[in-house]
């Protein structure tokens, strides 16, 4: 604990907060162009092929972004929108691609949590896709 004299001599410094998504430069989203689309494996104890893309942003950064949802239409030179948000089991992946905007199509046949995957509301007259539903 500092003395009053020490506080007069040197005031308290506020802790500097470090951003978790520096490539966004304080913006909620950023546009970018995919330079490489590939799959990678998560760290232990998980096992899968996670879909990720290397994206060159308008802010000048090149980052690795996760492609959420089942299936995607992204390839090299696709224009995408990214947001912050890391993937816990993929080291170095601190951004998510926003589905349903620009060249990233929404997830097909998505019934629940549609807004997170850019899926439109299904028409009420269509046949139900979930055949395993019980009464």
Curated annotation (Swiss-Prot):
The modification 3-methylthioaspartic acid is found at residue 89. Pfam families: Ribosom_S12_S23. The keyword Transcription does not apply. It comes from the Bacteria. It comes from Synechococcus sp. (strain JA-3-3Ab) (Cyanobacteria bacterium Yellowstone A-Prime). The keyword tRNA-binding applies. This is Small ribosomal subunit protein uS12. Part of the 30S ribosomal subunit. Contacts proteins S8 and S17. May interact with IF1 in the 30S initiation complex. One of its GO terms (molecular function) is structural constituent of ribosome. With S4 and S5 plays an important role in translational accuracy. Interacts with and stabilizes bases of the 16S rRNA that are involved in tRNA selection in the A site and with the mRNA backbone. Located at the interface of the 30S and 50S subunits, it traverses the body of the 30S subunit contacting proteins on the other side and probably holding the rRNA structure together. The combined cluster of proteins S8, S12 and S17 appears to hold together the shoulder and platform of the 30S subunit. One of its GO terms (cellular component) is small ribosomal subunit. One of its GO terms (biological process) is translation. Keywords: Methylation, Ribonucleoprotein, Ribosomal protein, RNA-binding, rRNA-binding, tRNA-binding. CDD domains: Ribosomal_S12 (cd03368). InterPro entries: NA-bd_OB-fold (IPR012340), Ribosomal_uS12 (IPR006032), Ribosomal_uS12_bac (IPR005679). Residues 124-135 have a biased composition (Low complexity). Belongs to the universal ribosomal protein uS12 family. Residues 113-123 have a biased composition (Basic residues). The gene is rpsL. Gene3D superfamilies: Nucleic acid-binding proteins.
């Amino acid at each position: 604990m500092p003395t009053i004299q020490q506080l007069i001599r040197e005031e308290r410094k506020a802790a500097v907060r470090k951003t978790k998504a520096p490539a966004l430069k304080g913006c909620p989203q950023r546009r970018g162009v995919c330079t490489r689309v590939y799959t990678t494996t998560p760290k232990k104890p998980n096992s899968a092929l996670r879909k990720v893309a290397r994206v060159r942003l308008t802010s000048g950064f090149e980052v690795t972004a996760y492609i959420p949802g089942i299936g995607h239409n992204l390839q090299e030179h696709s224009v995408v929108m990214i947001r912050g948000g890391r993937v816990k089991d993929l080291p170095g992946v601190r951004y998510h691609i926003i589905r349903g905007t620009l060249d990233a199509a929404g997830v097909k046949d998505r019934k629940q949590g549609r807004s997170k995957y850019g899926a439109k509301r299904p028409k009420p007259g269509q046949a139900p896709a979930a055949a395993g539903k019980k009464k």
